[in-house]
Amino acid sequence: MSFDRQQVPAWRPGYRFQYEPAQKGHVLLYPEGMIKLNDSAGLIGGLIDGQRSVAAIIDELQQQFPGVPEVADDIEQFMEVARAEHWITLA
C-alpha cells in the first residue's frame, strides 16, 4: 500500500505541538497527558500546519538535510504512526 503524499496533515482538536524547555524538546500536549517527541518527530511536527501536504513537508526537510536519503520514508512513517495514534488527521 502506498502513502498518498498529497494529503494534508493537521493536529486533531485538543492536541497542541510545542517546544517545552523543561523537557528540552518538542512535545505533543493533549487532555490526558503529554508525549515527548524525538528530534526527528519534532522537526516534522513543526511543519504540520493544516496547509502543507506531506509532499511539501518532505520537500522542505529534504532541502534541510540533502544527504539523508531516508527522509521521505521517515516522514511517511511518522504520519502513519501519528494517524494511528489519532494525533493528526490527513485530508
Swiss-Prot record:
Instruction: Write down the InterPro entries for this protein, in alphabetical order.
Output: PQQD, PqqD_bac, PqqD_sf
| Domain of life of the native organism | Bacteria
Q: What does the entry give for GO biological process?
A: pyrroloquinoline quinone biosynthetic process
Note the Pfam families from the entry. PqqD
Q: Quote the subunit structure annotation.
A: Monomer. Interacts with PqqE.
Q: Which NCBIfam families match?
A: PQQ_PqqD (TIGR03859), PRK02079.1 (NF002535)
Quote the protein name from its UniProt record.
Answer: PqqA binding protein
Species of origin: Pseudomonas entomophila (strain L48)
Q: Which gene encodes it?
A: pqqD
